[in-house]
């Protein structure tokens, strides 16, 4: 990157100017300005020639329309005015993440676009294919986005702060649109990168929403305002903080290009491990890394084989735009998707509406799950969803208990109620145009596999306690511990487990995670101790049973069940990880994960169900942003009949130099930034809390009755005759085997396609050998 002025010292007194500008687009009353970029930025640009002036001018639009009426009210976008065909739209949504998280994502996107431009043999991509890609950044609230992020956007030419005004002719501005084709990138170390790093120009649309209206509203701007204007083929969704691999976006796009019936594709999300994998020293991060790996090796491949992935991760996923479009009658995937925004926005405004839609509001906490189901079950179509393992992206995972609980509360509640929704509406599959074979397998996945998984999830608390109770109860019959030694040890840990679970209910109902993080941490540690104790007792039981084998013992059946269960978990996990050439998490994270299983099973489940009244995304809506009616644009007709506006602003060159100074200051004093923000849940009304109580009571009593029934039927020391324990162990084995078979099927399918495509290329290129692994 060419050296940008380093000798600048900021001046406290800024130059204020007033000027009249002629509006360049839109209809009467729409403010669209062409503003020159700062002089210092123009000096370092390698490309300045363009018939549209896209490298030397930034377009600002004060959008007074709602997203659904964007085009109808005369608003448009640069790419449409230039007559360009858009193949991919890349949308980055953000709230108040820091500049390091934003730079990490944006620089990764620019490297992906550079890769598209480097594919000279492609029929679609090539040298100038950056013109086919539009990057859209949507910031959720002008008073919420961090100033440091705006400084990075200013440095790349994509933002000029002095242009944003809350009103135009007394009409409220709902979104500020800044459009610029940038040639500058800033990496996560806050260092400038340019064309000497083989980066290509990138068309950027920065949409700065005036009010904070949640992420789903940001997607409304994307899908209902911008996409109808751009009409892209594929839409890629990214969260700020996610670092896509250099080929991730191409690999996602290729899934759509290869199969015309693919409506959505999920990339592989990896936990950010840090330099030298330092983050794995945190057990919480290590357990999440293992969980993500299991999902990417076992769950996602199985679902992809069926054609229906229950959730496409918002951090890295893609959709075919034509598949998202509604039917002519207004029903369809997007209509169902945005119903969640209407429900949640009305939650605090209309109590009666809240009563009618409480369960739907919880369901739409996982609105992306609803979108996935609506795509696969879209009437008269045969869309499928695919997992693209070669499209990878790193994301920062919660590193504290409070952040972890807040994130998983929404995931668990949304997933549970969304699963009920898809099970209830599974008959919609018969209105699709899928083949009979596909419909059959979708029923197997959705109605059988998902139903069994849902039942196990619902009774996971009781299954955990009963497994702990019967496994540790085997000590009661051990004579080596004395006449009553085994009984008292069992009783002590049994009461400890009951006390911890009871405490979790109390603290989850009455406390926020950020206010009670030490209590939650203590309870998680105690649960881990219980799990460690149960693990030790299990091994003792296995060793003792083997030692007494053939002497008339009655524990052989349960012994076989335990061994099979262990092989189905540790064994199959290890085997599939090796087959996928990705075994390192088994060595670095498996111990942390298995010790954290009780916390995943109990702590997260209890906290989520005890907070079903909270139907927020974890951020408070900014319904009353700071407004100044005097700070607005006034549009008038001049003597020539043209529309013009008076602008009072500061010197953009001075502003730009000050921005560069601030970025360098942050770079020299750079601290490790996480990109997280504390999120305060909305207060629920009395009705929502009443329903929460009923849900928790029903769930708790159902699990309690099941526990009491099993405890009455089987004695703790009679492990050898315990059919329930054997059933649970075999059920775990069977479910793990099903996942492994599906994962293996996906692997075979992937390699088969790779070799078929390679053979076709060999025939065309003179038998050139394949140069890469299909999974990478």
Swiss-Prot record:
Molecular function GO labels: chitin synthase activity
CDD domains (alphabetical): Chitin_synth_C (cd04190)
Description of how activity is regulated: Requires proteolytic activation.
Catalytic activity, as annotated: [(1->4)-N-acetyl-beta-D-glucosaminyl](n) + UDP-N-acetyl-alpha-D-glucosamine = [(1->4)-N-acetyl-beta-D-glucosaminyl](n+1) + UDP + H(+)
The protein's enzyme class: transferase
Keyword Iron: no
Induction info: Under certain adverse conditions.
GO cellular component, one term: plasma membrane
Keyword Transmembrane helix belongs to the record: yes
Membrane topology per record: Multi-pass membrane protein
Record keywords, A-Z: Cell membrane, Cell wall biogenesis/degradation, Glycosyltransferase, Membrane, Transferase, Transmembrane, Transmembrane helix
PANTHER family: CHITIN SYNTHASE, CHITIN SYNTHASE 2
Name of the protein: Chitin synthase 1
């Amino acid at each position: 990157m060419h050296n940008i002025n380093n000798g600048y010292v900021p001046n406290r007194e800024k130059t204020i100017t007033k000027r009249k500008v002629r509006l360049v687009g839109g209809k009467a009353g729409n403010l669209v300005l062409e503003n020159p970029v700062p002089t210092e930025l123009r000096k370092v640009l390698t490309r300045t020639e363009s018939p549209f002036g896209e490298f030397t001018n930034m377009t600002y639009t004060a959008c007074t329309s709602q997203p659904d009426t964007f085009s109808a009210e005369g608003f448009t976008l640069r790419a449409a005015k230039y007559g360009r065909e858009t193949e991919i739209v890349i949308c980055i949504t953000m709230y108040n993440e820091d500049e390091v998280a934003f730079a990490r994502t944006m620089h990764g996107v620019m490297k992906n676009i550079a890769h598209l431009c480097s594919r000279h043999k492609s029929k679609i991509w090539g040298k100038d294919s950056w013109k086919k890609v539009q990057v859209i950044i949507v910031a959720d609230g002008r008073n919420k986005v961090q100033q440091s992020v705006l400084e990075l956007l200013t440095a790349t030419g994509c933002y000029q702060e002095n242009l944003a005004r809350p009103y135009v002719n007394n009409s409220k501005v709902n979104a500020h649109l800044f459009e610029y084709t940038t040639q500058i990138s800033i990496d996560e170390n806050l260092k400038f990168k340019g064309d000497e790093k083989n980066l290509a120009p990138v068309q950027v649309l920065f949409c700065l929403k005036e009010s904070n209206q949640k992420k789903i509203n940001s997607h409304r701007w994307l899908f209902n305002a911008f996409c109808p204007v751009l009409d892209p083929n594929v839409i890629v969704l990214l969260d700020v903080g996610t670092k896509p691999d250099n080929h991730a976006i191409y690999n996602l796009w290729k899934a759509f290009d290869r199969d015309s019936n693919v409506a959505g594709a999920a990339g592989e999300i990896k936990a950010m491990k840090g330099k030298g994998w330092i983050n794995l020293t945190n057990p919480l991060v290590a357990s999440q890394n293992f969980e993500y790996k299991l999902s990417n090796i076992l769950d996602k491949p199985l679902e992809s084989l069926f054609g229906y992935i229950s959730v496409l991760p918002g951090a890295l996923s893609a959709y075919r735009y034509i598949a998202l479009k509604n039917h002519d009658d207004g029903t369809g995937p997007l209509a169902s998707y945005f119903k969640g925004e209407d429900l949640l926005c009305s939650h605090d405004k209309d109590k009666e509406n809240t009563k009618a839609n409480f369960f739907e509001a919880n369901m739409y906490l996982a609105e992306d799950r609803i979108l996935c189901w609506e795509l696969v079950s879209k009437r008269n179509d045969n869309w499928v969803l695919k997992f693209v393992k070669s499209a990878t992206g790193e994301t920062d995972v919660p590193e504290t208990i409070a952040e972890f609980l807040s994130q998983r509360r929404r995931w668990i509640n949304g997933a549970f109620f969304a699963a009920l929704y898809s099970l209830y509406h599974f008959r919609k599959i018969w209105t699709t145009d899928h083949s009979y074979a596909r419909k059959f397998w979708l029923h197997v996945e959705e109605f059988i596999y998902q139903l069994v998984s849902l039942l196990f999830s619902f009774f996971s608390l009781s299954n955990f306690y009963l497994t702990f109770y019967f496994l540790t109860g085997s000590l009661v019959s051990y004579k080596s511990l004395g006449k009553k030694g085994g009984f008292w040890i069992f009783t002590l840990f049994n009461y400890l487990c009951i006390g911890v679970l009871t405490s979790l209910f109390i603290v989850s109902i009455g406390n926020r995670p950020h206010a009670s993080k030490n209590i939650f941490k203590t309870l998680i540690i105690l649960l881990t101790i219980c799990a460690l104790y149960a693990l030790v007792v299990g091994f003792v039981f296995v060793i003792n049973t083997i030692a007494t084998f053939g002497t008339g013992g009655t524990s052989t059946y349960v012994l076989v069940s335990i061994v099979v269960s262990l092989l189905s978990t540790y064994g199959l996990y290890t085997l599939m990880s090796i087959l996928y050439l990705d075994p390192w998490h088994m060595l670095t994270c498996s111990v942390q994960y298995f010790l954290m299983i009780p916390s995943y099973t109990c702590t997260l489940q209890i906290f989520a169900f005890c907070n079903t009244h909270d139907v927020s995304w974890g951020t408070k809506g900014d319904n009353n942003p700071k407004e100044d009616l005097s700070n607005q644009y006034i549009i008038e007709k001049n003597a020539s009949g043209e529309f013009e506006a008076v602008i009072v602003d500061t010197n953009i060159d001075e502003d730009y130099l000050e921005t560069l100074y601030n970025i360098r200051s942050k770079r020299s004093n750079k601290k490790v930034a996480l990109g997280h923000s504390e999120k305060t849940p909305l207060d629920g009304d009395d009705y929502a809390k009443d329903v929460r109580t009923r849900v928790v009571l029903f769930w708790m009593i159902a699990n309690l009755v099941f526990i009491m029934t099993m405890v009455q039927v089987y004695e703790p020391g009679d492990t050898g005759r315990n059919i329930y324990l054997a059933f649970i162990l075999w059920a775990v084995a069977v479910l793990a085997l099903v996942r492994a078979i599906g994962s293996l099927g996906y692997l075979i399918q992937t390699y088969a396609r790779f070799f078929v495509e390679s053979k076709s290329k060999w025939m065309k290129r003179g038998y050139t050998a394949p140069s890469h692994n299909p999974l990478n």
